[in-house]
From Swiss-Prot:
EC number assigned by the record: 6.3.5.5
Biological pathway: Amino-acid biosynthesis; L-arginine biosynthesis; carbamoyl phosphate from bicarbonate: step 1/1; Pyrimidine metabolism; UMP biosynthesis via de novo pathway; (S)-dihydroorotate from bicarbonate: step 1/3
Domain Glutamine amidotransferase type-1: 193-378
UniProt superkingdom: Bacteria
Chain intervals for the UniProt region annotation (CPSase): 1-189
Protein's recorded name: Carbamoyl phosphate synthase small chain
Gene: carA
UniProt record similarity statement: Belongs to the CarA family.
Pfam families documented for this protein: CPSase_sm_chain, GATase
Enzyme class at the top of the EC tree: ligase
Length: 378
């Protein structure tokens, strides 16, 4: 027997549905994601910390869940909102239904609401703070008050909260269909040593670096640059992550010090924003952000249009780029900046997700550019 649930927005909007996860209450910034697949990757992406994710595709959970599709060791999304949860999950890789997965991970979630109406509200009014209440004891007034009490992501440093607490080495590559596994590659077969700052890194990023010959040392977000440079890395990677980049002063300071060397730097998502801040640019909070796997981005040098995976609520303000920073990618949805490079350093970054997971691989060659930069320095 299903239990009731409600979603309340800070503007007073109420959506009634049914609970499909854990009982209880959760608050966060409500965003919408237009990806048709990849719900498990989305839920386990640390970039979604403190966000309640609305999936616009109407049928979510058709293929169940499997440990191999997780992008981290836990669910980071604050909550989940969907239109319909299928009664049966059917896929040869399925290990657990989405509903059971949500309960097992203590995720408060709601189904059976008009996600089209919700998406229109978020599109027109911008991302809003919200509250999901699920179970027998729910109150519209209390839910609205909880939504309005959430401080919002502006000014919130979440990178240090989701980051690893300990340094570790990563040598697992991308999925191998023949062995049905993520093979671990011997260090002797990995010619490049990359130190990756973990601001909320997705494991598929690490796998794609290993696939291209990198032995990756993953360090906590607050690691000083001196410790990173002591590894004598061939390159430094700045990962994706949640929250507002501007409060991450420890990261900006460290990146500035790395940029004083000749070590190549590559940033993705939050790492892109932090690189821009370290170079002297500014960032801004977006209205409803970019969340999906079908976003067109143009390479400004070649004119080529790529379909990309996106997940960010902040953006680099192109008008604030200093003279030594050049725009190299732009969104064709709203013209916001998607990529930069430093003209006097071997450093570049991309706002979207070249590793996809979920999404297309049109931008994966940026990993190859990073490899080329490290090879040229040798």
């Amino acid at each position: 027997m299903t239990k009731p649930a409600i979603l309340a927005l800070a503007d007073g909007s109420i959506f009634r549905g049914e609970a499909i996860g854990a009982d209880g209450q959760t608050v966060g910034e409500v965003v919408f994601n237009t990806a048709m697949t990849g719900y498990q990757e989305i839920l386990t992406d640390p970039s979604y910390a403190q966000q309640i994710v609305t999936l616009t595709y109407p049928h979510i959970g058709n293929t169940g869940t499997t440990p191999e599709d997780a992008e981290s060791d836990r669910v980071w999304s604050a909550g989940l909102v969907i239109r319909d949860l299928p009664l049966v999950a059917s896929n040869w890789r399925n290990k657990m239904s989405l509903g059971d997965y949500l309960k097992a991970n203590n995720v408060v979630a709601i189904a059976g609401i008009d996600t089209r109406r919700l998406t229109r509200i978020l599109r027109e009014k911008g991302a809003q703070n919200g509250c999901i209440m699920a179970g027998d004891n729910i109150s519209e007034e209390a839910a609205i008050a909880a939504a309005r009490g959430f401080p919002g992501l502006k000014g919130m440093d979440l990178a240090k909260e989701v980051s690893t607490k300990d340094t570790y080495e990563w040598r697992h590559s991308v999925w191998n269909l023949q062995t049905d596994s993520h093979p671990e590659i011997a260090a002797s077969e990995l010619p490049y040593h990359v130190v990756a700052y973990d601001y909320g890194v997705k494991v598929n990023i690490l796998r794609m670096l290993v696939e291209r010959g990198c032995r990756v040392t993953v360090v906590p977000a607050q690691t000083p640059a001196s410790e990173v440079l002591a590894y004598k890395p061939d390159g430094v990677f700045l990962s994706n992550g949640p929250g507002d980049p501007e409060p991450c002063d420890y990261a900006i300071k460290a990146i500035k010090q790395v940029l004083e060397t000749e070590v190549p730097v590559f940033g993705i998502c939050l790492g892109h924003q932090l690189l821009a801040l370290a170079a002297g640019a500014k960032t801004v909070k977006m209205g409803h952000g970019h969340h999906g796997a079908n976003h067109p981005v143009q390479d400004l040098d070649t004119g080529v249009v790529m379909i990309t995976s996106q997940n960010h609520g902040f953006a680099v303000d192109e008008s604030t780029l200093p003279g030594n920073v050049r725009a190299i990618h732009k969104s064709l949805f709203d013209g916001t900046l998607q990529g930069i490079e430093l003209t006097d350093k071997s450093a570049f970054s991309f706002q979207g997700h070249p590793e996809a997971s979920p999404g297309p691989n049109d931008v994966a060659p940026l990993f190859d550019r990073f490899i080329d930069a490290m090879a040229k320095r040798r």
